[in-house]
Amino acid sequence: MSPKTETKASVGFKAGVKDYRLTYYTPEYQTKDTDILAAFRVTPQPGVPAEEAGAAVAAESSTGTWTTVWTDGLTSLDRYKGRCYDIEPVPGEENQFIAYVAYPLDLFEEGSVTNLFTSIVGNVFGFKALRALRLEDLRIPPAYSKTFQGPPHGIQVERDKLNKYGRPLLGCTIKPKLGLSAKNYGRAVYECLRGGLDFTKDDENVNSQPFMRWRDRFVFCAEAINKAQAETGEIKGHYLNATAGTCEEMMKRAVFARELGVPIVMHDYLTGGFTANTSLAHYCRDNGLLLHIHRAMHAVIDRQRNHGMHFRVLAKALRMSGGDHIHAGTVVGKLEGERDVTLGFVDLLRDDFIEKDRSRGIYFTQDWVSMPGVLPVASGGIHVWHMPALTEIFGDDSVLQFGGGTLGHPWGNAPGAVANRVALEACVQARNEGRDLAREGNEVIREACKWSPELAAACEIWKEIKFEFDVIDRL
Protein backbone atom coordinates (compact mmCIF):
# COMPACT_ATOMS: atom_id res chain seq x y z
CA MET A 1 0.00 0.00 0.00
CA SER A 2 1.40 3.39 -0.93
CA PRO A 3 1.80 6.19 1.64
CA LYS A 4 -0.83 8.17 -0.25
CA THR A 5 -3.38 5.35 0.08
CA GLU A 6 -2.57 4.93 3.78
CA THR A 7 -3.22 8.61 4.48
CA LYS A 8 -6.53 8.57 2.66
CA ALA A 9 -7.75 5.40 4.36
CA SER A 10 -6.81 6.66 7.82
CA VAL A 11 -9.19 9.60 7.73
CA GLY A 12 -11.88 9.18 10.41
CA PHE A 13 -10.22 6.13 11.95
CA LYS A 14 -8.09 6.06 15.09
CA ALA A 15 -6.59 2.77 16.16
CA GLY A 16 -5.96 1.86 19.78
CA VAL A 17 -7.61 0.47 22.91
CA LYS A 18 -11.13 1.78 23.48
CA ASP A 19 -12.39 3.81 26.38
CA TYR A 20 -15.77 2.08 26.66
CA ARG A 21 -17.38 5.00 28.50
CA LEU A 22 -17.26 7.18 25.42
CA THR A 23 -19.58 4.90 23.45
CA TYR A 24 -21.45 2.56 25.79
CA TYR A 25 -22.18 4.60 28.94
CA THR A 26 -25.32 6.61 28.12
CA PRO A 27 -27.07 7.82 31.29
CA GLU A 28 -29.40 10.00 29.20
CA TYR A 29 -30.84 6.96 27.36
CA GLN A 30 -34.58 6.35 27.72
CA THR A 31 -35.28 2.62 27.58
CA LYS A 32 -37.74 1.31 24.99
CA ASP A 33 -40.59 -1.13 25.53
CA THR A 34 -38.84 -3.51 23.13
CA ASP A 35 -35.44 -3.44 24.88
CA ILE A 36 -34.18 -6.42 26.82
CA LEU A 37 -32.99 -4.99 30.15
CA ALA A 38 -30.35 -6.55 32.39
CA ALA A 39 -29.21 -5.81 35.94
CA PHE A 40 -25.59 -6.84 36.56
CA ARG A 41 -23.80 -6.87 39.92
CA VAL A 42 -20.37 -5.54 38.92
CA THR A 43 -17.19 -5.75 41.00
CA PRO A 44 -14.49 -3.83 39.07
CA GLN A 45 -10.79 -4.38 39.48
CA PRO A 46 -9.11 -1.71 41.66
CA GLY A 47 -8.72 1.52 39.74
CA VAL A 48 -11.46 0.78 37.19
CA PRO A 49 -14.25 3.41 37.49
CA ALA A 50 -17.82 2.15 37.84
CA GLU A 51 -18.88 3.87 34.61
CA GLU A 52 -16.07 2.22 32.65
CA ALA A 53 -16.88 -1.20 34.13
CA GLY A 54 -20.59 -0.88 33.35
CA ALA A 55 -19.85 0.33 29.83
CA ALA A 56 -17.44 -2.58 29.33
CA VAL A 57 -20.19 -5.03 30.26
CA ALA A 58 -22.56 -3.39 27.77
CA ALA A 59 -19.92 -3.41 25.04
CA GLU A 60 -18.55 -6.91 25.46
CA SER A 61 -22.04 -8.45 25.68
CA SER A 62 -23.24 -6.70 22.52
CA THR A 63 -21.30 -5.10 19.64
CA GLY A 64 -18.00 -4.11 21.25
CA THR A 65 -14.48 -5.41 21.14
CA TRP A 66 -11.28 -4.20 22.78
CA THR A 67 -10.15 -1.94 19.95
CA THR A 68 -11.57 0.17 17.16
CA VAL A 69 -12.10 -1.85 13.97
CA TRP A 70 -12.60 -0.74 10.38
CA THR A 71 -15.92 -2.53 10.03
CA ASP A 72 -17.51 -0.33 12.72
CA GLY A 73 -18.07 2.08 9.85
CA LEU A 74 -20.13 -0.46 7.91
CA THR A 75 -22.95 -0.69 10.43
CA SER A 76 -24.89 1.52 12.83
CA LEU A 77 -23.54 1.10 16.34
CA ASP A 78 -26.21 3.43 17.69
CA ARG A 79 -28.84 0.99 16.49
CA TYR A 80 -27.23 -2.25 17.68
CA LYS A 81 -25.05 -1.49 20.70
CA GLY A 82 -25.91 -2.33 24.29
CA ARG A 83 -26.10 0.70 26.58
CA CYS A 84 -25.24 1.02 30.25
CA TYR A 85 -27.92 3.54 31.19
CA ASP A 86 -27.74 3.56 34.99
CA ILE A 87 -25.36 2.62 37.80
CA GLU A 88 -26.14 2.38 41.50
CA PRO A 89 -23.93 1.29 44.43
CA VAL A 90 -24.76 -1.94 46.27
CA PRO A 91 -25.60 -1.02 49.90
CA GLY A 92 -23.12 -2.43 52.38
CA GLU A 93 -20.60 -3.44 49.72
CA GLU A 94 -17.42 -1.55 48.88
CA ASN A 95 -16.60 -1.05 45.20
CA GLN A 96 -19.63 -3.01 43.98
CA PHE A 97 -22.35 -1.66 41.71
CA ILE A 98 -25.55 -2.61 39.93
CA ALA A 99 -25.13 -1.72 36.26
CA TYR A 100 -28.30 -1.55 34.18
CA VAL A 101 -27.86 -2.42 30.52
CA ALA A 102 -30.37 -2.11 27.67
CA TYR A 103 -30.06 -4.32 24.59
CA PRO A 104 -31.86 -3.69 21.28
CA LEU A 105 -34.17 -6.54 20.33
CA ASP A 106 -32.48 -7.04 16.96
CA LEU A 107 -29.37 -8.45 18.67
CA PHE A 108 -31.14 -11.74 19.45
CA GLU A 109 -32.53 -14.61 17.43
CA GLU A 110 -36.24 -15.15 17.93
CA GLY A 111 -37.22 -18.11 20.12
CA SER A 112 -33.64 -18.94 21.17
CA VAL A 113 -32.61 -18.88 24.82
CA THR A 114 -29.29 -20.29 23.61
CA ASN A 115 -28.57 -17.18 21.54
CA LEU A 116 -29.82 -14.83 24.28
CA PHE A 117 -27.46 -16.33 26.86
CA THR A 118 -24.53 -16.61 24.47
CA SER A 119 -24.55 -12.82 24.22
CA ILE A 120 -25.60 -11.62 27.67
CA VAL A 121 -23.72 -14.18 29.80
CA GLY A 122 -20.98 -15.06 27.34
CA ASN A 123 -17.35 -13.93 27.13
CA VAL A 124 -18.00 -10.81 29.20
CA PHE A 125 -17.87 -12.94 32.38
CA GLY A 126 -14.18 -13.58 31.80
CA PHE A 127 -13.31 -9.92 31.23
CA LYS A 128 -10.09 -9.00 33.07
CA ALA A 129 -11.21 -5.49 34.04
CA LEU A 130 -13.87 -7.08 36.26
CA ARG A 131 -13.06 -8.89 39.47
CA ALA A 132 -16.54 -10.48 39.45
CA LEU A 133 -19.80 -10.17 37.53
CA ARG A 134 -23.28 -11.50 38.28
CA LEU A 135 -26.47 -11.23 36.25
CA GLU A 136 -29.18 -10.48 38.82
CA ASP A 137 -32.25 -10.11 36.60
CA LEU A 138 -33.54 -9.71 33.05
CA ARG A 139 -36.59 -7.90 31.69
CA ILE A 140 -37.94 -9.86 28.73
CA PRO A 141 -40.24 -7.62 26.65
CA PRO A 142 -43.44 -9.08 25.17
CA ALA A 143 -42.01 -8.46 21.70
CA TYR A 144 -39.39 -11.12 22.48
CA SER A 145 -41.28 -13.47 24.81
CA LYS A 146 -44.00 -13.88 22.17
CA THR A 147 -41.44 -15.56 19.90
CA PHE A 148 -41.29 -18.49 22.36
CA GLN A 149 -43.81 -21.29 22.82
CA GLY A 150 -43.06 -21.44 26.55
CA PRO A 151 -44.30 -24.30 28.76
CA PRO A 152 -45.81 -27.21 26.82
CA HIS A 153 -49.12 -26.96 28.71
CA GLY A 154 -49.04 -24.77 31.82
CA ILE A 155 -50.72 -24.91 35.21
CA GLN A 156 -54.41 -24.91 34.28
CA VAL A 157 -54.08 -27.47 31.50
CA GLU A 158 -52.11 -29.76 33.83
CA ARG A 159 -54.79 -29.56 36.49
CA ASP A 160 -57.43 -30.37 33.89
CA LYS A 161 -55.42 -33.36 32.63
CA LEU A 162 -54.99 -34.69 36.18
CA ASN A 163 -58.47 -33.65 37.38
CA LYS A 164 -56.93 -32.36 40.62
CA TYR A 165 -57.77 -28.95 42.05
CA GLY A 166 -57.60 -26.92 45.24
CA ARG A 167 -54.37 -28.28 46.70
CA PRO A 168 -50.67 -28.69 45.95
CA LEU A 169 -49.69 -31.83 44.09
CA LEU A 170 -47.65 -34.46 45.94
CA GLY A 171 -44.54 -36.17 44.61
CA CYS A 172 -41.67 -38.41 45.62
CA THR A 173 -38.19 -39.00 44.22
CA ILE A 174 -37.37 -42.71 44.22
CA LYS A 175 -34.39 -43.54 46.43
CA PRO A 176 -31.70 -44.78 46.39
CA LYS A 177 -31.28 -42.67 43.29
CA LEU A 178 -28.82 -45.14 41.75
CA GLY A 179 -28.43 -48.91 42.01
CA LEU A 180 -31.97 -50.33 41.91
CA SER A 181 -33.01 -52.79 39.22
CA ALA A 182 -35.84 -51.70 36.94
CA LYS A 183 -38.33 -54.11 38.52
CA ASN A 184 -37.57 -53.04 42.10
CA TYR A 185 -37.66 -49.43 40.98
CA GLY A 186 -41.12 -49.95 39.48
CA ARG A 187 -42.26 -51.60 42.69
CA ALA A 188 -41.31 -48.51 44.71
CA VAL A 189 -43.16 -46.32 42.19
CA TYR A 190 -46.31 -48.43 42.54
CA GLU A 191 -46.24 -48.42 46.34
CA CYS A 192 -45.85 -44.64 46.53
CA LEU A 193 -48.59 -43.92 44.00
CA ARG A 194 -50.96 -46.43 45.60
CA GLY A 195 -50.37 -44.77 48.97
CA GLY A 196 -51.74 -41.43 47.77
CA LEU A 197 -49.06 -39.52 45.86
CA ASP A 198 -49.82 -37.87 42.53
CA PHE A 199 -46.34 -38.33 41.08
CA THR A 200 -43.12 -40.20 41.56
CA LYS A 201 -39.87 -39.14 39.97
CA ASP A 202 -36.60 -40.29 38.47
CA ASP A 203 -33.70 -38.54 40.14
CA GLU A 204 -31.70 -36.20 37.94
CA ASN A 205 -28.82 -38.62 37.34
CA VAL A 206 -31.01 -41.62 36.50
CA ASN A 207 -30.53 -41.94 32.74
CA SER A 208 -29.55 -45.34 31.31
CA GLN A 209 -26.88 -47.02 33.42
CA PRO A 210 -25.74 -50.67 33.42
CA PHE A 211 -27.84 -51.54 36.49
CA MET A 212 -31.05 -50.13 34.94
CA ARG A 213 -31.43 -49.35 31.25
CA TRP A 214 -33.91 -46.64 30.35
CA ARG A 215 -36.29 -48.82 28.34
CA ASP A 216 -36.68 -51.35 31.17
CA ARG A 217 -37.32 -48.55 33.66
CA PHE A 218 -39.92 -46.94 31.43
CA VAL A 219 -41.83 -50.23 31.00
CA PHE A 220 -41.90 -51.13 34.70
CA CYS A 221 -42.86 -47.58 35.71
CA ALA A 222 -45.70 -47.51 33.17
CA GLU A 223 -46.97 -50.79 34.62
CA ALA A 224 -46.80 -49.30 38.13
CA ILE A 225 -48.72 -46.20 37.03
CA ASN A 226 -51.49 -48.21 35.40
CA LYS A 227 -51.87 -50.52 38.38
CA ALA A 228 -51.97 -47.63 40.89
CA GLN A 229 -54.52 -45.75 38.77
CA ALA A 230 -56.76 -48.81 38.60
CA GLU A 231 -56.66 -49.29 42.37
CA THR A 232 -57.08 -45.66 43.46
CA GLY A 233 -59.27 -44.18 40.72
CA GLU A 234 -56.87 -41.21 40.51
CA ILE A 235 -54.68 -40.13 37.61
CA LYS A 236 -51.03 -40.82 38.43
CA GLY A 237 -47.68 -40.10 36.83
CA HIS A 238 -43.96 -40.76 37.05
CA TYR A 239 -41.37 -38.31 35.74
CA LEU A 240 -39.49 -40.49 33.25
CA ASN A 241 -36.12 -38.83 32.72
CA ALA A 242 -35.53 -38.55 28.98
CA THR A 243 -32.17 -36.75 29.38
CA ALA A 244 -29.52 -38.44 27.23
CA GLY A 245 -26.13 -37.95 25.65
CA THR A 246 -27.57 -36.77 22.33
CA CYS A 247 -30.72 -34.91 21.31
CA GLU A 248 -31.67 -37.81 19.05
CA GLU A 249 -31.51 -40.29 21.93
CA MET A 250 -33.47 -37.90 24.18
CA MET A 251 -36.25 -37.65 21.62
CA LYS A 252 -36.30 -41.44 21.16
CA ARG A 253 -36.95 -41.83 24.89
CA ALA A 254 -39.71 -39.21 24.84
CA VAL A 255 -41.38 -40.96 21.89
CA PHE A 256 -41.28 -44.30 23.73
CA ALA A 257 -42.81 -42.68 26.83
CA ARG A 258 -45.65 -41.34 24.70
CA GLU A 259 -46.20 -44.79 23.17
CA LEU A 260 -46.49 -46.26 26.68
CA GLY A 261 -49.26 -43.76 27.42
CA VAL A 262 -47.61 -42.09 30.43
CA PRO A 263 -48.58 -38.46 31.16
CA ILE A 264 -45.20 -36.84 31.86
CA VAL A 265 -41.48 -36.94 31.04
CA MET A 266 -38.51 -35.15 32.56
CA HIS A 267 -35.40 -33.28 31.46
CA ASP A 268 -32.27 -31.91 33.17
CA TYR A 269 -32.40 -28.58 31.38
CA LEU A 270 -29.03 -27.10 32.35
CA THR A 271 -26.87 -30.16 31.79
CA GLY A 272 -28.96 -31.12 28.76
CA GLY A 273 -28.86 -27.60 27.32
CA PHE A 274 -31.45 -25.06 26.24
CA THR A 275 -31.54 -26.15 22.61
CA ALA A 276 -32.37 -29.73 23.60
CA ASN A 277 -34.87 -28.53 26.20
CA THR A 278 -36.76 -26.31 23.76
CA SER A 279 -36.94 -29.14 21.22
CA LEU A 280 -38.33 -31.50 23.87
CA ALA A 281 -40.86 -28.89 25.05
CA HIS A 282 -42.17 -28.51 21.50
CA TYR A 283 -42.52 -32.29 21.19
CA CYS A 284 -44.36 -32.47 24.52
CA ARG A 285 -46.92 -29.87 23.48
CA ASP A 286 -47.52 -31.55 20.13
CA ASN A 287 -47.97 -34.96 21.76
CA GLY A 288 -49.82 -34.22 25.01
CA LEU A 289 -46.95 -34.90 27.42
CA LEU A 290 -46.29 -32.81 30.51
CA LEU A 291 -42.64 -31.83 31.04
CA HIS A 292 -40.93 -31.85 34.43
CA ILE A 293 -37.66 -29.92 34.66
CA HIS A 294 -34.79 -30.59 37.03
CA ARG A 295 -32.22 -27.84 37.62
CA ALA A 296 -29.12 -29.99 38.23
CA MET A 297 -25.96 -27.83 38.00
CA HIS A 298 -27.79 -24.60 38.89
CA ALA A 299 -25.80 -24.00 42.09
CA VAL A 300 -22.55 -23.99 40.10
CA ILE A 301 -23.98 -20.98 38.28
CA ASP A 302 -26.13 -19.18 40.84
CA ARG A 303 -24.91 -19.83 44.40
CA GLN A 304 -22.13 -17.23 44.66
CA ARG A 305 -23.36 -13.74 45.50
CA ASN A 306 -20.82 -11.88 43.42
CA HIS A 307 -20.31 -13.95 40.30
CA GLY A 308 -22.50 -16.00 37.96
CA MET A 309 -26.21 -15.65 37.46
CA HIS A 310 -29.15 -15.57 39.87
CA PHE A 311 -31.65 -18.41 39.68
CA ARG A 312 -34.46 -15.97 38.88
CA VAL A 313 -32.78 -15.50 35.48
CA LEU A 314 -32.55 -19.26 34.97
CA ALA A 315 -36.22 -19.52 35.95
CA LYS A 316 -37.25 -16.94 33.36
CA ALA A 317 -35.14 -18.72 30.76
CA LEU A 318 -36.85 -22.01 31.57
CA ARG A 319 -40.30 -20.47 31.25
CA MET A 320 -39.38 -19.32 27.74
CA SER A 321 -37.59 -22.53 26.75
CA GLY A 322 -40.41 -24.68 28.07
CA GLY A 323 -41.28 -26.77 31.13
CA ASP A 324 -44.41 -27.43 33.18
CA HIS A 325 -42.58 -27.98 36.50
CA ILE A 326 -39.21 -26.81 37.79
CA HIS A 327 -37.44 -27.34 41.09
CA ALA A 328 -37.37 -24.10 43.06
CA GLY A 329 -35.94 -24.91 46.49
CA THR A 330 -37.97 -25.33 49.67
CA VAL A 331 -37.02 -22.45 52.04
CA VAL A 332 -37.37 -24.95 54.92
CA GLY A 333 -35.46 -28.02 53.65
CA LYS A 334 -31.83 -28.95 53.02
CA LEU A 335 -31.22 -26.77 49.95
CA GLU A 336 -30.31 -23.09 49.65
CA GLY A 337 -33.16 -20.57 49.40
CA GLU A 338 -34.21 -17.47 51.34
CA ARG A 339 -37.98 -17.02 51.65
CA ASP A 340 -38.41 -13.62 49.98
CA VAL A 341 -35.98 -14.45 47.18
CA THR A 342 -37.66 -17.81 46.56
CA LEU A 343 -41.15 -16.31 46.50
CA GLY A 344 -39.91 -13.69 44.05
CA PHE A 345 -38.87 -16.19 41.40
CA VAL A 346 -41.85 -18.45 42.18
CA ASP A 347 -44.09 -15.55 41.15
CA LEU A 348 -41.96 -15.06 38.02
CA LEU A 349 -42.65 -18.70 37.16
CA ARG A 350 -46.40 -18.73 37.83
CA ASP A 351 -47.90 -15.29 37.30
CA ASP A 352 -48.73 -13.35 34.13
CA PHE A 353 -47.62 -9.93 35.41
CA ILE A 354 -45.04 -9.33 38.14
CA GLU A 355 -44.31 -5.85 39.48
CA LYS A 356 -40.80 -4.66 40.23
CA ASP A 357 -40.08 -5.41 43.90
CA ARG A 358 -36.49 -5.03 45.08
CA SER A 359 -37.40 -6.45 48.51
CA ARG A 360 -37.83 -9.81 46.74
CA GLY A 361 -34.97 -9.34 44.30
CA ILE A 362 -37.16 -8.43 41.32
CA TYR A 363 -35.37 -5.62 39.48
CA PHE A 364 -37.85 -5.15 36.62
CA THR A 365 -41.57 -5.37 36.02
CA GLN A 366 -42.15 -8.50 33.94
CA ASP A 367 -45.17 -8.98 31.65
CA TRP A 368 -45.46 -12.53 30.29
CA VAL A 369 -48.63 -11.63 28.35
CA SER A 370 -50.32 -14.98 27.65
CA MET A 371 -47.41 -17.37 28.23
CA PRO A 372 -48.49 -20.33 30.42
CA GLY A 373 -47.10 -20.60 33.94
CA VAL A 374 -44.76 -23.16 35.48
CA LEU A 375 -45.44 -25.10 38.70
CA PRO A 376 -42.62 -24.63 41.24
CA VAL A 377 -41.45 -27.88 42.83
CA ALA A 378 -40.39 -27.85 46.49
CA SER A 379 -37.98 -30.73 46.99
CA GLY A 380 -34.97 -31.51 49.14
CA GLY A 381 -34.83 -32.57 52.80
CA ILE A 382 -38.53 -32.08 53.59
CA HIS A 383 -40.87 -34.25 55.69
CA VAL A 384 -44.34 -34.15 57.26
CA TRP A 385 -43.45 -31.54 59.88
CA HIS A 386 -42.63 -29.15 57.02
CA MET A 387 -46.05 -29.60 55.38
CA PRO A 388 -47.78 -26.59 57.04
CA ALA A 389 -44.94 -24.23 56.11
CA LEU A 390 -44.75 -25.57 52.55
CA THR A 391 -48.51 -25.23 52.07
CA GLU A 392 -48.42 -21.68 53.41
CA ILE A 393 -45.32 -20.61 51.44
CA PHE A 394 -46.02 -22.17 48.03
CA GLY A 395 -49.84 -22.26 47.94
CA ASP A 396 -51.95 -24.56 45.80
CA ASP A 397 -50.11 -24.15 42.49
CA SER A 398 -47.03 -26.14 43.43
CA VAL A 399 -45.63 -29.65 43.69
CA LEU A 400 -44.40 -30.77 47.12
CA GLN A 401 -41.92 -33.58 46.65
CA PHE A 402 -40.80 -35.84 49.49
CA GLY A 403 -38.12 -38.43 48.63
CA GLY A 404 -36.56 -39.58 51.87
CA GLY A 405 -39.62 -38.08 53.56
CA THR A 406 -41.71 -40.81 51.91
CA LEU A 407 -39.37 -43.77 51.42
CA GLY A 408 -37.78 -43.33 54.86
CA HIS A 409 -41.03 -44.14 56.69
CA PRO A 410 -40.41 -46.93 59.22
CA TRP A 411 -43.37 -48.97 57.90
CA GLY A 412 -42.50 -48.79 54.21
CA ASN A 413 -43.13 -46.81 51.05
CA ALA A 414 -46.94 -46.90 50.87
CA PRO A 415 -47.38 -45.83 54.54
CA GLY A 416 -44.90 -43.01 53.87
CA ALA A 417 -47.09 -41.83 51.00
CA VAL A 418 -50.20 -42.12 53.17
CA ALA A 419 -48.57 -39.98 55.87
CA ASN A 420 -47.75 -37.21 53.40
CA ARG A 421 -51.21 -37.25 51.80
CA VAL A 422 -52.95 -37.09 55.19
CA ALA A 423 -50.66 -34.25 56.33
CA LEU A 424 -51.35 -32.30 53.13
CA GLU A 425 -55.13 -32.79 53.28
CA ALA A 426 -55.11 -31.70 56.95
CA CYS A 427 -53.14 -28.54 56.16
CA VAL A 428 -55.33 -27.60 53.20
CA GLN A 429 -58.50 -28.13 55.25
CA ALA A 430 -57.12 -26.08 58.15
CA ARG A 431 -56.14 -23.26 55.79
CA ASN A 432 -59.56 -23.30 54.15
CA GLU A 433 -61.16 -23.04 57.60
CA GLY A 434 -59.16 -19.87 58.24
CA ARG A 435 -56.48 -21.24 60.53
CA ASP A 436 -53.01 -19.70 60.45
CA LEU A 437 -50.63 -22.44 59.32
CA ALA A 438 -47.57 -20.37 60.19
CA ARG A 439 -48.66 -20.30 63.84
CA GLU A 440 -50.81 -23.40 64.21
CA GLY A 441 -49.14 -25.77 61.76
CA ASN A 442 -47.65 -28.17 64.29
CA GLU A 443 -50.97 -28.39 66.11
CA VAL A 444 -52.75 -29.19 62.83
CA ILE A 445 -50.33 -32.06 62.19
CA ARG A 446 -50.69 -33.42 65.73
CA GLU A 447 -54.48 -33.40 65.44
CA ALA A 448 -54.28 -35.31 62.16
CA CYS A 449 -52.05 -37.94 63.80
CA LYS A 450 -55.04 -39.08 65.88
CA TRP A 451 -56.73 -40.38 62.73
CA SER A 452 -53.65 -41.66 60.89
CA PRO A 453 -51.19 -44.07 62.52
CA GLU A 454 -48.98 -43.72 59.42
CA LEU A 455 -48.69 -39.97 60.00
CA ALA A 456 -48.08 -40.46 63.73
CA ALA A 457 -45.18 -42.81 62.97
CA ALA A 458 -43.70 -40.34 60.47
CA CYS A 459 -43.97 -37.48 62.95
CA GLU A 460 -42.15 -39.50 65.56
CA ILE A 461 -39.29 -40.56 63.31
CA TRP A 462 -38.61 -37.05 61.92
CA LYS A 463 -39.41 -34.86 64.92
CA GLU A 464 -35.76 -33.89 65.47
CA ILE A 465 -34.66 -33.48 61.83
CA LYS A 466 -33.70 -29.90 60.93
CA PHE A 467 -31.40 -28.20 58.42
CA GLU A 468 -30.43 -24.97 60.15
CA PHE A 469 -27.66 -23.27 58.18
CA ASP A 470 -27.27 -19.66 57.16
CA VAL A 471 -28.41 -18.80 53.65
CA ILE A 472 -25.51 -17.65 51.44
CA ASP A 473 -27.46 -15.71 48.81
CA ARG A 474 -29.30 -12.98 50.72
CA LEU A 475 -30.87 -9.82 49.34
Curated annotation (Swiss-Prot):
The keyword tRNA-binding does not apply. Binds 1 Mg(2+) ion per subunit. RuBisCO catalyzes two reactions: the carboxylation of D-ribulose 1,5-bisphosphate, the primary event in carbon dioxide fixation, as well as the oxidative fragmentation of the pentose substrate in the photorespiration process. Both reactions occur simultaneously and in competition at the same active site. It is found in: Plastid, Chloroplast. Pfam families: RuBisCO_large, RuBisCO_large_N. The disulfide bond which can form in the large chain dimeric partners within the hexadecamer appears to be associated with oxidative stress and protein turnover. The active site is at 175 (proton acceptor), 294 (proton acceptor). Residues 1-2 form a propeptide. Keywords: Acetylation, Calvin cycle, Carbon dioxide fixation, Chloroplast, Disulfide bond, Lyase, Magnesium, Metal-binding, Methylation, Monooxygenase, Oxidoreductase, Photorespiration, Photosynthesis, Plastid. The basic functional RuBisCO is composed of a large chain homodimer in a 'head-to-tail' conformation. In form I RuBisCO this homodimer is arranged in a barrel-like tetramer with the small subunits forming a tetrameric 'cap' on each end of the 'barrel'. Mg(2+) binds at residues 201, 203-204. Its cofactor is Mg(2+). The modification N6,N6,N6-trimethyllysine is found at residue 14. This is Ribulose bisphosphate carboxylase large chain. The record marks 334 as: Transition state stabilizer. GO terms for biological process: photorespiration; reductive pentose-phosphate cycle. The keyword Acetylation applies. Its main location: plastid. The modification N-acetylproline is found at residue 3. InterPro entries: RuBisCO, RuBisCo_large_chain_AS, RuBisCO_lsu_C, RuBisCO_lsu_C_sf, RuBisCO_lsu_fd_N, RuBisCO_lsu_N_sf, RuBisCO_lsuI. It comes from Pinus balfouriana (Foxtail pine). The gene is rbcL. Belongs to the RuBisCO large chain family. Type I subfamily.
